[in-house]
Amino acid sequence: VGAALALGYPVLLPDGDGANNIYAINRVASHVILDSMRMVHEQHDFPLAKSHFVSLGASHGGMMTGYTAAEQPYYAPDLTAYVNQFVVNEGAPDLIKLAHSFGLYGELQNAPSVYGSFLMSFVVGAAREYPDLLPHLYQWFTPYGKAVVKGNRSICTPLTFAVGPGVPIKNIVKEGFFASQTFKNMLQIAKYSSSFYYPG
């Protein structure tokens, strides 16, 4: 950001997580990014109506940017002539494969995972954006899981650190969660949010 500003380029910083933390809900985040670009063209305070864009994201920003690249031709075809490039750094395109590799579920779900906190952040965002698919989600949390979510659910970084490293996933959700319809719906939401499964 600093380098771009030093070179005289305007910088747009859309909040893809939103005020209430929708971590890794990338379809929604992609609309935030694309609508922000449209806003740049439509506002009248600065002479930017014909501005072109380079969209850059790393880590979670990379996931959002990758999904935005897939979604843009369908959701915002009016921006095609103005988006020069999407640059993705460390943006996982497949959240389900990522969860497997991190041991968030599957064979390693009983082992301590330093990434359990990221699962919680995703779960909170999914519950907020897809309540129709997850009507019974919170009944699957253990007392520990409920306490962590209640105290930190509206702020991404504290939620990430609140669970902390070395906490087995079984301490967060009750036995049977991974065989439940709620979990199956969660996998579907993960597909919705993964550019690897993008239907376009």
Indicate where each model-derived feature is located.
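Short amphipathic alpha-helix adjacent to the substrate-entry channel of hydrolases
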Residues: 1-11
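Extracytoplasmic/secreted proteins, especially bacterial periplasmic and envelope-associated proteins
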Residues: 3, 28, 32-35, 64-67, ...
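Short beta-to-alpha linker loops that shape the active-site pocket of alpha/beta-hydrolase fold enzymes
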Residues: 10, 15-19
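Short, proline-enriched alpha-helix->beta-strand connector loops that line the catalytic pocket
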Residues: 82, 197-200
